[in-house]
């Protein structure tokens, strides 16, 4: 009998058999493809890409040719060698290796917390369950968006891309975070919260009556439709609100700053269900550990690929440790009966209580919420340095006519914040490395986008086309035939060229024997998958306030 613990559909974290054998998913640990992992680890046997024909039908009587045998050999040895190098570098064995990438630094952080009374701080500031639910509503990921005025239009000229160096680690070192339990507060205006935002963290529901962008030339609207708890007659731009009759959203003071810069509210706005907590910097033992992780990663550039890969994963995982949901569904599957069990029947509040009482819980969730908010604000500061802001993705901006003086001023402010906290630059191979600064990441002569995670560029130096399309491998750029005019809604990236595979799951009622004598049951088919490029819909600014609504006024003096 086999029991399978699943983190999401078709992605088991591990499989445990009654005879003691446990199968662990190395992909979740590596957080990259076997090809990339073997390259990063510089193992003897790299993945032999291109030697396997995925369209060929094989069974137990098929004779493998030399290329197929070589592919199988390299696939197996690459995985074994990558895993062994990881074990050796971490001083772990197959029993003690963490299941996931975030497990690598977790043990170190827990030991540091134990030595520095981190658990005591956690118990002092951890939120109750009701506040935790609100924090999860406030939390958002990275901001990814394109300029609606240039949808499906090829932009030509000198297009530069800037990105932040270790954006999230920088935010964890440079800014203040909620450092006490949240306390209830009366309804208030956004202006009141912004006036006190330096010393206090706020979470609240923002009520906006007739919100609208102040100017149509605001290129990146911030209000996210999917995070709104209520929206009436919203006109959206690829998931972001341009205007609406009414909107409600849980947010904090840092995100509020951007919202108030961009939107007017003809009918007024109000903050309700307000809670606040005093701010302070993250504990020194934690920020020192983050900074040392950055130093280690930087000093390993061009050195031992194994140690560099692990150091990079460690640095990138420190933020993720702060925003893991304390209560999440855990699915178990009995492979003999095929039955699933989910812990959704358990009381979420009770599960949260167990999480807070666990001695290994040392990093409060609210810290991670503010990390993404600070990074969100920094991204908009970076975007404001571009004369024309074309595209943004979490920690990078594509644009034209960059204001170099504003960029330099921003970078200088980043360095000052770090120096004020006692953290400087790292010198390696005659170069200076800083956390958080905006660095030139590429120059392009052409740019076109049809939506978030769907854009193509022409490199200014090489003249080659490159694409970023969620769900399409980078080699899909070949489909464009060196012409960005082909990058439009309705264009098909064919699976034969891109190498993208579609997973088709076949579920059988019983085990049966096929014509080749194979016992068959549930199976997965991999076949070439084409990708149809679509585009975001151009918005109609006149389509607003189409229906009569009745808005509850929470405070007559403010609304």
Residue positions per predicted region:
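Conserved acidic
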Residues: 1-559
């Amino acid at each position: 009998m086999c029991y399978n613990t699943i983190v999401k559909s078709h992605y088991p974290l591990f499989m445990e058999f009654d005879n003691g054998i446990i199968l662990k998913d190395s992909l979740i640990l590596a957080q990259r493809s076997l090809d990339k992992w073997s390259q990063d680890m510089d193992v003897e046997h790299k993945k032999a890409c291109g030697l396997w024909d995925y369209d060929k039908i094989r069974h137990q009587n098929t004779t493998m040719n030399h290329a197929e045998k070589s592919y199988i050999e390299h696939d197996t040895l690459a995985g074994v060698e990558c895993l062994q190098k990881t074990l050796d570098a971490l001083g772990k064995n197959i029993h003690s290796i963490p299941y996931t990438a975030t497990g690598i630094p977790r043990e170190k952080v827990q030991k540091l917390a134990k030595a520095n009374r981190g658990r005591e701080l956690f118990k002092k500031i951890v939120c109750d369950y009701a506040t935790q639910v609100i924090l999860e509503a406030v939390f958002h990921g990275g901001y990814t968006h394109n300029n609606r005025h240039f949808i499906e239009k090829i932009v030509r000229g000198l297009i530069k891309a800037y990105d932040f160096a270790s954006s999230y680690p920088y935010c964890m070192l440079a800014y203040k975070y909620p450092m006490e339990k949240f306390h209830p507060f009366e309804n208030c205006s956004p202006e009141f919260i912004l006036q006190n935002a330096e010393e206090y963290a706020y979470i609240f529901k923002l009520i906006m009556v007739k919100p609208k962008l102040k100017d149509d030339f605001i290129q990146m609207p911030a209000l996210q439709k999917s995070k709104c708890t209520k929206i009436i007659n919203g006109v959206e731009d690829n998931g972001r609100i341009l205007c609406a009759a009414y909107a409600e959203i849980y947010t904090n003071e840092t995100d509020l700053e951007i919202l108030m810069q961009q939107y007017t509210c003809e009918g007024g706005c109000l903050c309700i269900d307000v809670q606040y907590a005093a701010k302070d910097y993250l504990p020194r033992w934690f920020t020192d550990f983050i900074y040392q992780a950055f130093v280690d990663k930087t000093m390993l550039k061009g050195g031992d690929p194994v140690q560099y890969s692990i150091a990079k994963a460690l640095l990138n995982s420190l933020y993720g440790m702060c925003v893991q949901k304390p209560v999440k569904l855990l699915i178990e599957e009995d492979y003999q009966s095929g039955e699933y069990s989910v812990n959704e029947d358990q009381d979420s509040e009770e599960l949260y209580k167990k999480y807070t009482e666990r001695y290994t819980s040392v990093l409060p969730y609210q810290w991670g919420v503010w990390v993404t908010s600070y990074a969100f604000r920094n991204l908009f500061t970076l975007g404001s340095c571009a004369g024309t802001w074309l595209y943004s993705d979490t920690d990078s901006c594509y644009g034209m006519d960059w204001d170099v003086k504003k960029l330099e001023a921003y970078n200088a402010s980043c360095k000052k914040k770090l120096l004020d906290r006692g953290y400087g630059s790292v010198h390696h191979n005659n170069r200076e490395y800083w956390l958080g600064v905006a660095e030139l990441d590429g120059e392009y002569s052409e740019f076109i986008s049809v939506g978030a995670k769907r854009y193509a560029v022409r490199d200014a130096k090489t003249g080659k086309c490159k694409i970023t399309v969620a769900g399409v491998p980078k080699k899909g750029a070949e489909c464009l035939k060196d012409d960005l005019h082909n990058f439009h809604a309705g264009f098909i990236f064919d699976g034969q060229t891109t190498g993208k595979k579609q997973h088709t799951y076949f579920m059988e009622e019983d085990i049966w024997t096929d014509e080749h004598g194979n016992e068959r049951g549930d199976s997965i088919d991999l076949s070439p998958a084409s990708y149809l490029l679509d585009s975001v819909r151009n918005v109609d600014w006149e389509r607003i306030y189409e229906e009569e609504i009745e808005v509850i006024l929470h405070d007559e003096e403010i609304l």
